[in-house]
Amino acid sequence: IHGGREPRIGADGGYQENFIRGMEESARERAERVARAFPLRPGERVLDLGGGAATYAVAWAEGYPGAAITVFDTPGTLRVTRKVLREKGAEARVRLVEGDFLEDPLGGPYDFVWISQILHAFAVPDCLRLLRRARASLAPGGRAAVQEVFLADGETSPPRPGFFSGPMGGVAGGGASSPCCGRVSL
């Protein structure tokens, strides 16, 4: 589970790489649209917080060659990210920073912070702390965007986030029904 810290799975027999690559495949269809929806100016500094396989980071790097793109994620995830970036020939365009989302410096200041599909992995207090840390990493006038799974108010629909929410809530106290998923703001 991608929760800001190394998974407790340990020597997982390839599970983490399979998970990260699966997330990359899932994000690939949206990445270019997201990069166009949040255009960058030359020289802008971007933080992809919990960037996983760097799918969105690569889309920004390709679409906006003058931008400085950073992916912050856990060391185990970034082992996979490095492989993916080499495969795409993008390792020189994306800077990688390893750490614990809640403890280690995020760097910055950044002009844009992208937070995609990580908030559901946190219990409410940690989720709020992470959002505050992201806000603190922004330059004056900086902006942030969050992409996340959401449940309707009854917390049972739509089906995909509903099925997803149960396991996440059991693991980290998060889940798609967490107040961090749609009910808080930077």
Question: Can you name each region flagged by the protein language model?
Answer:
Residues I1-E44:
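Conserved Class I S-adenosyl-L-methionine-dependent methyltransferase catalytic core
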Residues R45, L49-L186:
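Alpha-helical subdomain
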